[in-house]
């Protein structure tokens, strides 16, 4: 019988913040003050074994040695084996995810990579490599420790929401029994989702189809509006078509595409699914692999009240609640790191109806994937008969990574496990490839319900088989089921029947089921093998389809050769019946105390600012990927100080130049460092008599002084088509009145979106994500919400669609609205930060009444309010039209929508973001000041020039919009509020900002050491730019494009920005994406069938990315992966030897790999290379930082940028360099091998030393290193993400100064192009085999091939036209 074995690997580490608290609590007990506690970071490795211990024994040893070698920290400390007996010999405390449950997502990702040792071997079956922590106790008092102290540690370190469990030897269950009991006992359905969206495979139309509505300005049909989250036809969108090149087969796919990608394109991170909306995309597709608490990405709430945030010293209860929230926020942040989607101001909200439930978070997202190319009907009896007539059989094939039973987030058993998103992407692309290369009619049906909630295997088999049955061998069952089965005989029939049903048929599956018609020669199976193997997508044949309708027959022979059958009746999901439980009533508001004369005090304002809904979201925004692979033109951080305030985001569809060029100068059609120019310059460089052209001394400098002629240059960037999205919600109020909450959510989404570069509000497409409890009246409630939303949107001439609908667990009602609109960037938009002292502040209201009920002021004060109103379409239309006029006429300097916290919070946030203050005046004598200041009536706060106030008010009157001047922007340290002449508030801005950021800072402190204090970010942002060259953009097309080989490593996101920057700069990038699994029938050094390698035709190699396994072990594991997938290292080493080619490494993992080649920073004395340091925050950082390019750097790419100080994006968990030989490392600067350094905010600030300007607080603030000859460059920051100025966090040349029209980072790529072209021409001259000195008389030169002179007399001089050797001809 199959069992499990366990090994423990660990190394001594610093205690975590929570462990520090536990140690302090333990030492406070009398007698334990001097106890010695050693903390260790560890991994539990379990593997399956058989009763025969010698079976595969050598392979087991090799696998464990491989794992041991891979588990290393950033400073090369190795995880060493610890005998399990050591855990019992003394008092120890081991805790982590439950070892007797499903492996965690991080474990799955590590195991997947580590099991790729060799394609020719059967790798030993590792079950998990799961992270845990150890505490060893010794010294005085340790003998007193007992189960009471153990319980104390368990209470602190293994709370209800940490999902960690203590581990002891006796708790380890070596059997596999738990696999048979962890799956849900019944089919789980989301009745709300099923009712709203129906089922495409069963031709069940959902109720949403009755409400989805396309406006005249929404260029999609009624049937498409459910699938496509666009508001217009996207004409210019990147076409990343994939061509799988397999020997003897050739290319597949479009040959005319600009970007080429080769076989093995598989290991991708979260790609969104177009068939679900904003909430659904995040919830169902974006939970990345390394999350330990993947309850995020659901619907947008913090579900418990946060207390004690205003205290300087938090109580024990507050710390515990903060810890629970931190787990959630960290997981939510990691969800977005590799997703490549826009983050629209992360927000949290308190719900009055929920208590002690796990926290959740929500972000806006936009899917830009296309529709699947396959819409096939399930097979019928006629289909089977037709196949049999042609001597074919119908086979059912399982495609993809099943991950049985791991997809239900609401199942607490599986809460530690969630698919990373890459599996879904691999499956989606592999199925596309299969449809391209398979002959028509051979793929009968594809059932891919991996994108929905209902993914039960039984349902999927029933849908795939249609009217037919399935006959399969027991050997085709999944491995985890086979491990649980007893011997296949009549005696164990009932037991095996139950195991197959409970562990396979009744659980979720993330795989797709494909029905194919194949013959005895397996023609279709072979093509399937090609298509799916190219993507690294696993598949196996389950069985044959039979005429036995709706029956699954699993058979095999027993030990006597008799056939033993187990039969199951197929089940199809039916339209859910009415609920059995009534929908809970909304809260009774009649007994709530209402405030009438609440005073406006400093304490009230500080309470509101401290509220998590209003407070700063830096703990989220600064620790997630904000750049979306370069597609995001507006992320949450705004203003010179990168304050996360923006409530809309802009996603650009196409990163390649050529979208919109209105207003640009006329430029020549093509540009290039052509042959004629290059040859003359090369000849001039080597014109000294006797100088050999093969002399490499000068070769490296070729092309470094050449500049592209000015007639090809423009000082403006092309505009791009994009999509603007805003989010709105009113979850707290929705508990009381779902219909009014729906309207308020739609209005807020529109007011957010209109601030972006939108030109026509009638192009809005409103998407709704609905969550209601399942009860008797849930259908009526859902229909009422959709009907109300459709009527409101149709009155506004908006398009409307239901993005998602789901069961609101915990009696939760929630409606989140997204407003999408097409836009052009850069375009007129209003950012929420004050820009100019002396400017006027205007309040623009949707309605003259105040809206206070359910607002943040009520929550903070504990006193309710009854003031509400219902917005009308005409009011919203007038408000949006007015805002479009203000933007079009450039009458406003900045703007912010009024929502949570009211007018006063919007003003405070604009002060924080702009570094200025404000003076507010309430003019109405009869009005209580608390009402206008804290009212959450939809509207805007506008900053305008004083001379434009009258013009704006006149236009507001024209559109019947209330517009009132309420104050002015001042350059002061104090914020003041007056009610006529009475001063209500006078508060230092620093105190307001401290309270606004208090919650965010409290969360950040949970990730640092006990004695570590993160400094105030007072110096962050407001950068000064220094240029030594005038930047320009090239719009002309390149004549010939040098090839660049881009290696994407396992776990790294797709580099759209990199490919676009290379393409826009004249290169032709070839991308090789590695799937993390070996290919069959392949040489050891190959990683993908037919993928390109570095050769004379490759101008350079780019290594790109950071691992999505969030630990040092992740990068170390990738390095071990490289030991058996040698193509990357072989390519890099071959490229290092080839003169005239460059290597560029961007990202922490790419830098580590380049350092491993010893090309950069290698110290021959110590035989050491640089290593990377972890961030001081111990978290992923996404920062807009200032960098200086040294004046004397040898880096070829930075030749034009020498001496410049420029800001750029830097993202990752390890953003600093160091070296074991510090003296040698410091000398790199004098050797001119430092390519870039972290710089302070101003040019004269010099090198940055503190966090966050130097994220690791490294002694040597190096951000980029280069080789001795400058050809090879390793960068921690990513210039690709700042290639266009609209990608910049904040575009200014200095504090309070103007903007740059063109990004200087373009010059980096232009220089690489020129350098590469010159070296191509130089190699062409070498290949002509002429004499190696130039005398400028071709008749004196030798003919390259004398034996091919033909009829030309040997004695006659041979004249060779100069252009005859032009390689571009």
Swiss-Prot record:
Give the CC-aspect GO terms: host cell; viral tegument
> Sorted alphabetically, which Pfam families does this protein's record hold?
AIRS_C, GATase_5
| Keywords of the record | Virion, Virion tegument
One Gene Ontology BP term is: purine nucleotide biosynthetic process
Fetch the InterPro entries from UniProt.
Answer: Class_I_gatase-like, Herpes_virus_tegument, PurM-like_C_dom, PurM-like_C_sf, PurM-like_N_sf
Instruction: Tell me where on the tree of life, at the top rank, the source sits.
Output: Viruses
Location in or out of the cell: Virion tegument
Query: Where is this chain primarily localised?
Result: virion
Region span, Disordered: 1347-1369
The GO molecular function terms of this record are: phosphoribosylformylglycinamidine synthase activity
This protein is called what? Answer: Probable tegument protein antigen 3
- What is the species of this protein? Alcelaphine herpesvirus 1 (strain C500) (AlHV-1)
Query: What's the name of its gene?
Result: 3
């Amino acid at each position: 019988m199959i069992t499990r074995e366990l090994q423990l690997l660990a190394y001594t580490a610093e205690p975590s913040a929570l462990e520090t608290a536990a140690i302090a609590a333990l030492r406070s007990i009398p007698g334990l003050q001097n106890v010695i506690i050693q903390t260790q970071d560890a991994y539990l490795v379990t593997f399956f074994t058989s009763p025969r211990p010698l079976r595969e024994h050598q392979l087991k040893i090799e696998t464990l040695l491989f794992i041991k070698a891979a588990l290393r920290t950033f400073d090369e400390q190795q995880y060493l084996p610890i005998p399990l007996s050591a855990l019992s010999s003394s008092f120890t405390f081991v805790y982590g995810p439950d070892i007797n449950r499903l492996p965690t997502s991080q474990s799955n990702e590590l195991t997947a990579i580590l099991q790729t040792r060799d394609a020719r071997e059967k790798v030993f079956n590792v079950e998990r490599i799961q992270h845990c922590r150890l505490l060893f106790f010794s010294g005085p008092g340790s003998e007193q420790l007992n189960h009471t102290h153990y319980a104390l540690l368990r209470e602190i370190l293994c709370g209800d929401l940490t999902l960690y469990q203590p581990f002891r030897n006796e708790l380890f269950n070596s059997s596999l029994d738990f696999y048979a009991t962890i799956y849900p006992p019944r089919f789980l359905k989301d009745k709300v989702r099923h009712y709203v969206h129906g089922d495409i495979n069963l031709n069940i139309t959902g109720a949403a189809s009755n409400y989805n509505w396309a406006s005249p300005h929404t260029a999609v049909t009624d049937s498409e509006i459910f699938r496509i989250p666009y508001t217009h036809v996207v004409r210019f969108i990147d076409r990343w078509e994939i061509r799988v090149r397999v020997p003897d087969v050739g290319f597949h796919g479009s040959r005319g595409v600009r970007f080429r990608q080769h076989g093995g394109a598989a290991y991708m991170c979260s790609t969104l699914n177009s068939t679900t909306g904003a909430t659904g995309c995040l919830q169902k597709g974006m939970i990345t692999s390394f999350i330990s608490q993947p309850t995020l990405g659901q619907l947008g709430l913090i579900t418990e009240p946060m207390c004690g945030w205003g205290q300087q010293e938090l109580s024990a209860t507050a710390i515990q609640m903060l810890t629970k929230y931190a787990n959630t926020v960290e997981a939510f942040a990691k969800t977005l790191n590799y997703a490549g989607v826009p983050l629209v101001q992360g927000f949290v909200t308190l719900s009055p109806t929920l208590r002690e439930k796990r926290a959740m978070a929500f972000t806006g997202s936009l899917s830009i994937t296309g529709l699947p190319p396959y819409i096939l009907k399930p097979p019928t009896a006629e289909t089977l008969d037709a196949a049999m007539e042609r001597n074919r059989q119908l086979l059912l094939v399982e495609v993809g990574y099943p991950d049985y039973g791991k997809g239900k987030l609401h199942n607490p058993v599986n809460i530690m496990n969630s698919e990373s998103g890459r599996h879904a992407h691999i499956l989606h692309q592999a199925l596309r490839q299969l449809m391209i290369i398979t002959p028509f009619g051979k793929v009968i049906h594809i059932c891919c319900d991996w994108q929905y909630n209902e993914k039960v295997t039984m349902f999927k088999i029933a849908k795939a088989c249609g009217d037919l049955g399935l006959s399969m061998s027991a050997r085709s069952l999944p491995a985890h089921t086979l491990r649980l089965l007893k011997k296949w005989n009549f005696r164990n029939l009932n037991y095996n029947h139950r195991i197959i049903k409970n562990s396979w048929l009744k659980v979720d599956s993330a795989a797709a089921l494909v029905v194919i018609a194949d013959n005895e020669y397996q023609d279709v199976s072979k093509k399937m093998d090609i298509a799916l193997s190219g993507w690294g997508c696993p598949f196996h044949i389950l069985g044959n389809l039979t005429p036995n309708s709706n029956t699954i027959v699993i058979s095999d022979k027993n030990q006597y050769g008799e056939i033993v059958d187990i039969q199951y009746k197929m089940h199809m999901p039916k339209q859910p019946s009415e609920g059995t439980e009534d929908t809970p009533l909304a809260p009774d508001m009649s007994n709530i105390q209402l405030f009438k004369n609440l005073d406006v005090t400093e304490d009230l304002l500080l309470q509101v600012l401290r509220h998590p809904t209003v407070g700063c979201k830096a703990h989220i925004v600064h620790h997630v990927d904000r750049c979306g692979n370069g597609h995001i033109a507006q992320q949450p951080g705004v203003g010179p100080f990168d304050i996360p305030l923006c409530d809309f985001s802009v996603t650009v569809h196409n990163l390649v130049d050529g979208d919109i060029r209105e207003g640009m100068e006329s430029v020549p059609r093509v540009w290039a460092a052509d042959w004629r120019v290059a040859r003359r310059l090369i000849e001039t460089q080597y014109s000294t008599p006797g100088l050999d052209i093969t002399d490499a001394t000068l070769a490296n400098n070729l092309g470094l002084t050449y500049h592209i002629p000015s007639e090809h240059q423009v000082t403006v960037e092309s505009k791009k088509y994009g999509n603007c999205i805003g989010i709105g919600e009113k979850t707290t109020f929705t508990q009381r009145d779902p219909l009014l909450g729906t309207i308020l959510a739609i209005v807020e989404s529109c007011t957010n979106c209109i601030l972006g570069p939108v030109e026509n509000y009638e192009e809005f497409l409103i998407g709704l994500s609905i969550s209601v409890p399942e009860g008797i009246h849930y259908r009526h409630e859902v229909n009422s919400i959709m009907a109300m939303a459709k009527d409101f949107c149709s009155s506004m001439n908006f398009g409307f669609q239901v993005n998602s609908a789901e069961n609101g667990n915990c009696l939760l009602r929630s409606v989140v609205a997204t407003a999408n609109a097409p836009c052009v960037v850069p375009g007129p938009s209003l950012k929420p930060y004050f820009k100019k002292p002396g400017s006027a502040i205007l309040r623009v209201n949707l309605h003259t009444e105040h809206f206070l009920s359910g607002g943040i002021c009520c929550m903070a004060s504990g006193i309710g309010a009854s003031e509400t109103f219902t917005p009308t379409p005409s009011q919203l239309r007038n408000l949006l039209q007015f805002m479009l006029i203000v933007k079009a006429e450039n009458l406003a300097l900045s703007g912010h929508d009024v929502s949570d916290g009211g007018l006063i919070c919007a003003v405070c946030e604009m002060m924080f973001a702009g570094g200025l203050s404000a003076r507010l005046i309430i003019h109405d004598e009869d009005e209580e000041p608390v009402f206008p200041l804290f009212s959450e009536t939809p509207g805007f706060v506008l900053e305008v020039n004083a001379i434009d106030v009258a013009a704006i008010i006149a236009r507001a009157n024209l559109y019947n919009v209330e517009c009132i001047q309420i104050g002015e922007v001042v350059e002061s340290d104090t914020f003041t509020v007056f009610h006529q002449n009475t001063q209500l508030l006078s508060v230092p801005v620093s105190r307001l900002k401290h309270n606004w950021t208090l919650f965010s800072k409290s969360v950040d402190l949970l990730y640092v050491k006990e004695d570590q204090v993160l400094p105030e970010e007072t110096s962050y942002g407001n950068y000064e730019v220094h240029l030594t060259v005038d930047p320009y953009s090239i719009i002309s097309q390149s004549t010939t494009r040098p090839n660049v080989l881009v290696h994407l490593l396992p776990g790294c996101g797709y580099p759209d920005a990199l490919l676009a920057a290379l393409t826009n700069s004249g290169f032709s990038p070839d991308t090789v994406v590695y799937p993390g699994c070996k290919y069959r029938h392949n040489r050891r050094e190959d990683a993908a069938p037919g993928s390109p390698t570095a050769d004379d035709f490759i101008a350079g190699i780019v290594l790109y990315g950071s691992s999505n396994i969030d630990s040092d072990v992740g990068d170390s594991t990738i390095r071990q992966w490289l030991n058996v997938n040698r193509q990357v290292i072989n390519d890099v080493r071959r490229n290092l030897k080839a003169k005239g080619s460059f290597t560029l490494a961007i990202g922490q993992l790419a830098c580590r790999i380049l350092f491993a080649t010893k090309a950069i920073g290698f110290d021959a004395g110590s035989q050491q290379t640089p290593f990377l340091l972890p961030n001081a925050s111990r978290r992923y950082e996404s920062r807009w930082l200032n960098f200086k390019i040294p004046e004397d750097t040898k880096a070829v790419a930075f030749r034009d940028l020498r001496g410049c100080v420029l800001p750029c994006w830097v993202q990752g968990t390890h953003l600093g360099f160091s070296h074991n030989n510090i003296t040698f490392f410091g000398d790199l600067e004098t050797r001119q091998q430092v390519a870039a350094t972290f710089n302070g905010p101003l040019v004269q600030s010099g090198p940055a030393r503190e966090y966050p300007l130097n994220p690791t607080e490294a002694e040597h603030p190096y951000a980029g290193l280069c080789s001795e000859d400058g050809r090879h460059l390793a960068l921690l920051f990513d210039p690709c993400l700042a290639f266009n100025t609209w990608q910049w966090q904040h575009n200014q040349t200095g504090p309070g100064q103007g903007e740059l029209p063109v990004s200087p980072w373009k010059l980096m790529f232009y220089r690489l192009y020129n350098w590469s072209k010159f070296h191509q021409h130089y190699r062409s001259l070498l290949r002509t085999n002429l004499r190696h000195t130039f005398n400028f008389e071709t008749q004196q030169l030798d003919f390259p091939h004398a034996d091919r002179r033909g009829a030309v007399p040997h004695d006659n001089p041979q004249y060779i036209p100069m252009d005859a050797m032009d390689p571009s001809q």
